[in-house]
Amino acid sequence: MFQTNFIFQTKKYMLSAATIFLLLVSMILTACGGAGDEKKDTAQKDKPIEITDVTGQKVTLKKPAERVVVQWSASGGAFLTMAALTGKNVTNLIVGIDPSLSKYRTDMWNHFKADLPELEKIPLIGAVNEKTFDTEKVVSLNPDVIFIPLYMKEQYESDVKPKLDAAGIPTVYIDYHAEKLENHQRSIEAIGKALGKEERAAELKQFYTDHVTKVTDRINKISKPKPTVYIEVGMQGPESFGYAFSSNYSWGALATLCGGDIITKDVIKTGGPVNPEFVLEKDPDIIMIMGSYWPKKPTSMRLGFEADEAASQQLLKAFTQREGWDKLKAVKNKQVYSAHHGLPREIYDCVVFEYLAKTYYPEEFADIDPEATLKEFYEKFLPFSYGGTWFMHLN
């Protein structure tokens, strides 16, 4: 009996020892594997990145950018793309920003900083297009990259770029202003690659592409006459004529792609006001007065996060009371509209495609809901909450 128990106990202890040995070996191998994975991740993170920007130039970064300077944060810059790619971490990545978001999109700025208070702590570095860009300050911030809208390339290369090149700060050009699908796609890709967020950038690009092509594919099949359209930025109020557009820039390019015939296409190079008589002579089918929040201009068209529907209706109505406008087709036929001026030249301007197409061809786009698309974009990509009034048809 004693011998049997002894043999049993011996086997039991041998099994326990073997089990412990196997567990130890497994832990060691796992630890080694983890260390190897960690080294692999670190090596990947520190691996040089080659980016092709919208100009076709190749830019090499030593690693994914962790310190970034941006321009034209109000529209057409990298700010919203970075926010969509990196979420709340965007305030840690941007080390220098221009003042246009707070200056020209006050409603958006107020709303964004309420959701993300760290935005206010990002150093202001001026704007290239306003000749206030502080090159020395930017160099002292030691950014890994600066994203520059293509539209300011000439001035940037004349006034700023040589000094940044000398300091070893790479420049990546992006372009949302031309409203070309390929340029939007390449800009998203370039920013995503620079930040090491290629997978997220692919999602963003796909969302944008799907919504835009759904509109343009349908527009290409419409054979009816194009409505004539006058678009003006209502920043100055009814008393002064604001910016209108050519057919290759911002609202003008968008309207053209969406099947509108821009009446200012041959009289403006990119953007600028026209003579009041010109609009009366052209007598457009549709008038669009674009709004935002310009608090220093109380009669300006107001839309966005801080807009009141009834008050904005009255502001829009005031534009139709300009001299001679009561005789215009668009006014008589109740074809006067507004949309937020912060929507074009951006990663979410696919909603502008939807809104313009539905405005110009309501029957063909009856199933499209641009406001629902904008809300979906905010909820899916941006670290900011959705709200406000972004589109309006004059009652």
Annotate each language-model stretch with its function.
Residues I28-A31:
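C-terminal motif of bacterial Sec signal peptides marking the signal peptidase cleavage site
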Residues L22-L24:
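Hydrophobic alpha-helical transmembrane signal-anchor segments
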Residues G33-N395:
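N-terminal ligand-binding lobe of clamshell/alpha-beta domains
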Residues Q3-T19:
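Bacterial N-terminal signal peptides that target proteins for export
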